Amino acid sequence: MNGAAQKPIEEANVWIRDSFDSEREWIIELSPSAINDIEKAVDAAADAGHAPQDLRPETFPLPRLKATLSDIYEIIENGRGFAVVRGWPSERHNHQENLLAFCGIAAYFGEAKVQNYEGEPIVDVIDKDKPYDYTSRGYMSNKRLPFHSDGADLVGLLCLGEPAEGGTSLLLSATHLYNTILQEKPEYLTTLTRGFYHHRRGQHDPGESPLSPERIPIFSFSNGLLHCCYNRNPIEWVVHEGIALSDDEIEVLDYFDALCHRPGMAVEMEFRRGDMQFVNNFVILHSRTEYRDALEYKRHLVRLWLENANSKRGAGGLLDIYVPGSSKVSQEHAAE
């Protein structure tokens, strides 16, 4: 990975909210025949005893949906960078069947990776009454999550339960952010490409450093393509280990965050039960508003981190600091 090229990015993933006429542009509705295919594949996978995270296209055949899923991956990899698959009838299936359906579809986009120190490839995003601080992960809280990236090539979310209020999903183009910074504050790119240490939030072995071993660039380029890796909170939480950000670094981060929240930058979406959202983690930043659950039902998402060996943007990311030795970058280093 090398430093950022000082020229505007011209790709399909450079967009603002007004680039889209309506949500219909990113929603792909499942047809009855496609749903039937998925249900048959779910039954076959269950009968064969396949674990959801181990599914592959060959063990989860979807003849009527295969071409559509190929088109969706093209959108995620080379297009706007995100898509929502809508129409899966999650309410008529049990939890295991829903996991098989979600992981089976996701298998056409990439391989499920472990997401945390506990070794979980499938994570429940649900309020566990945990604080969102340097001792826990954001998926355990109902608090607002600022714009950030996750740990692998792609992020997948399946909605199994809606909140009483809040929980809006927001996405924005990291390539558009880069272009805007290049135009408005090009001098900030030095700090953004140098990067920052991240707090590992206890996701490491005893005796290991609580910080990332190296600075993680917010902007870097791999194969000539932008790779954005950002989460401000773990950057600031290094103060608990005796490291303070400089005034200049805080100024750059404040500008970056203000730019993320500039009106017209992000698209918003409300998840329905059965929705499956897939996002290119290296060109899209995502956020979530705070939410409130009802007494009788809760917001419940299931998350996958996916890696695709054919991704043009395949490079290291936050996966390395939360799951040491698990990511492809760590595996490559171990093989050297």
Regions found by a protein language model. Give the residues of each.
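Active-site environment of non-heme Fe oxygenases that use a 2-His-1-carboxylate facial triad
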Residues: 1-66, 70-72, 78, 83, ...
